[in-house]
């Protein structure tokens, strides 16, 4: 009985791996909402936006609300209330972005916009183009609020990498998943864990690359550097596979 159960578990494990490999091969070679390719592009944009706002807009993070909460606490603790309050509006903008992303999944909205993932990418691209036209005289708060909103819509709309939950514009959760996959791959010798580790490592490296590019381009081109991120999103939208059943994560 024990041997039979072991063989059954091995068979199920192999079947699960084959299903994963099939799905991974499908989403890697076609740019869909769950593909590694799109995940890489979105991670680059996520890193870029945080670097852009931090370098050019008064040291505020657009996508990392954890960072904003930490900075809020630090500055309030030092009695710098005015400095601390600047970190609050991006938090509310982030919440609003989540609400918009959820609203795009409503049947009444999908009838008008049948490909919500493309709608999200186009919305992001247009907003970032507009932000790039704003002169430096525009208050930093307005810029960071706008970018926080856009980033939130992206994060809430694209939440699956192949078949794993992930974050397209932050790195902490992805790093945890990569570490867990590393244990599964190296200690338990699980091939599926190895593939997961490779996928999430690519996402993490892409985020870092986006931050590097965002810093260098912002220092060189100033506020218009954000058009680089807009271009990435526009390219992603144009090549994204038009499949309304898989374009937007619904869970």
Regions found by a protein language model. Give the residues of each.
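Alpha-helical transmembrane segments of multi-pass membrane proteins
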Residues: 8-251
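N-terminal acidic, proline/glycine-rich, low-complexity intrinsically disordered segments
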Residues: 1-6
């Amino acid at each position: 009985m024990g041997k039979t159960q072991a063989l059954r578990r091995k068979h199920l494990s192999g079947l699960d791996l084959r299903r994963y490999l099939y799905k991974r091969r499908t989403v890697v070679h076609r740019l869909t909402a769950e593909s590694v390719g799109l995940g890489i592009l979105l991670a680059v944009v996520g890193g870029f936006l945080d670097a852009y706002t931090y370098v050019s807009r008064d040291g505020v993070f657009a996508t990392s609300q954890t960072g904003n909460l930490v900075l809020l606490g630090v500055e309030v603790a030092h009695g710098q209330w005015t400095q601390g309050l600047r970190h609050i509006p991006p938090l509310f903008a982030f919440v609003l972005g989540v609400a918009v992303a959820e609203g795009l999944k409503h049947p009444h909205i999908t009838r008008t916009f049948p490909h919500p993932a493309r709608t999200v990418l186009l919305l992001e691209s247009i907003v970032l183009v507009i932000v790039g036209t704003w002169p430096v005289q525009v208050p930093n708060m307005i810029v960071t609020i706008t970018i926080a909103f856009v980033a939130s819509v992206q994060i809430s709309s694209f939440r699956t990498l192949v078949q794993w939950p992930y974050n397209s514009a932050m790195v902490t959760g992805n790093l945890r998943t990569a570490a867990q996959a590393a244990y599964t791959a190296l200690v338990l010798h699980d091939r599926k864990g190895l593939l997961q580790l490779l996928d999430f490592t690519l996402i993490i490296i892409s985020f870092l690359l986006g931050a590097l590019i965002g810093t260098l381009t912002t220092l060189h081109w100033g506020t218009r550097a954000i058009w680089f991120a807009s271009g990435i999103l526009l390219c992603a939208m144009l090549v994204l596979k038009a499949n309304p059943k898989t374009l937007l994560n619904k869970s």
